[in-house]
């Protein structure tokens, strides 16, 4: 008997499972978003991402590998001409699984699996920031004596700036503390005068 695949078993036998995943992948590439059970979505994700990776290569051998799973030539054409170019800059994570409410009939946990077609701009900004930080670190390594003195004076100035702020807050706390006992003393005096009457 063949070793079962990792993850939940989806159908009766291995052939049924392969065909079910192939049909799910075909529907995903055709509609770019499908609703299915969580177990099927989790099993579909690695297959779909591997097929998109083949499509990003774009050669004939990759197209034939994809055609062994996805039998619809129109969907394969869409995958290679529209979806793969949209994912060209993305290094992975081509799909997104979002859990939705349970199915009405049998209360099965449902999920939406969709292709992530948004551009990858936030990552590019992070990469640019990281390269700038690397350049700054290289400059500091070249001339470490002068920036250290500047940092020390900046640190002294910041400590001096913080110290008056702490004194101001301490004065406010003391003033509030001074007012509170006086109010309490007046209230006590009124109570004692009421009891004497």
Swiss-Prot record:
Keyword Ribonucleoprotein: yes
InterPro entries: Ribosomal_bL17 (IPR000456), Ribosomal_bL17_CS (IPR047859), Ribosomal_bL17_sf (IPR036373)
Extent of Basic and acidic residues compositional bias: 188-197
Compositional bias ranges of the Acidic residues kind: 148-187
Any Gene Ontology biological process: translation
A GO cellular component annotation in the UniProt record: cytosolic large ribosomal subunit
Ribosomal protein listed as a keyword: yes
Region (Disordered): 136-197
Keywords attached to this entry: Ribonucleoprotein, Ribosomal protein
Source taxon at top rank: Bacteria
Molecular function as annotated in GO: structural constituent of ribosome
Pfam family, one: Ribosomal_L17
UniProt subunit comment: Part of the 50S ribosomal subunit. Contacts protein L32.
Family: Belongs to the bacterial ribosomal protein bL17 family.
NCBIfam families: L17
Protein name, entry field: Large ribosomal subunit protein bL17
Source organism per UniProt: Beutenbergia cavernae (strain ATCC BAA-8 / DSM 12333 / CCUG 43141 / JCM 11478 / NBRC 16432 / NCIMB 13614 / HKI 0122)
């Amino acid at each position: 008997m063949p070793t079962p695949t990792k993850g939940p078993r989806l159908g009766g036998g291995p052939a049924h499972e392969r065909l079910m995943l192939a049909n799910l992948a075909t529907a995903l590439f055709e509609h770019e978003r499908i609703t299915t059970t969580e177990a099927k979505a989790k099993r579909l994700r690695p297959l779909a991402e591997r097929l998109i990776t083949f499509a990003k290569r774009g050669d004939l051998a990759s197209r034939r590998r994809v055609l062994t799973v996805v039998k619809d030539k129109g969907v394969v054409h869409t995958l290679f001409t529209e979806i793969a170019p949209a994912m060209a800059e993305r290094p992975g994570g081509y799909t997104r699984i979002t859990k939705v409410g349970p199915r009405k009939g049998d209360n099965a946990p449902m999920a939406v699996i969709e292709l992530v077609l948004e551009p990858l701009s936030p990552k590019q900004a992070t990469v640019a920031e990281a390269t700038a930080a690397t350049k700054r670190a290289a400059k500091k390594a070249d001339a470490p004596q002068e920036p250290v003195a500047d940092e020390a004076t900046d640190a002294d100035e910041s400590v001096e700036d913080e110290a008056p702020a702490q004194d101001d807050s301490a004065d406010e706390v003391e003033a509030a503390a001074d007012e509170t006992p006086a109010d309490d003393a007046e209230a006590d005096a009124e109570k004692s005068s009421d009891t004497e009457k």
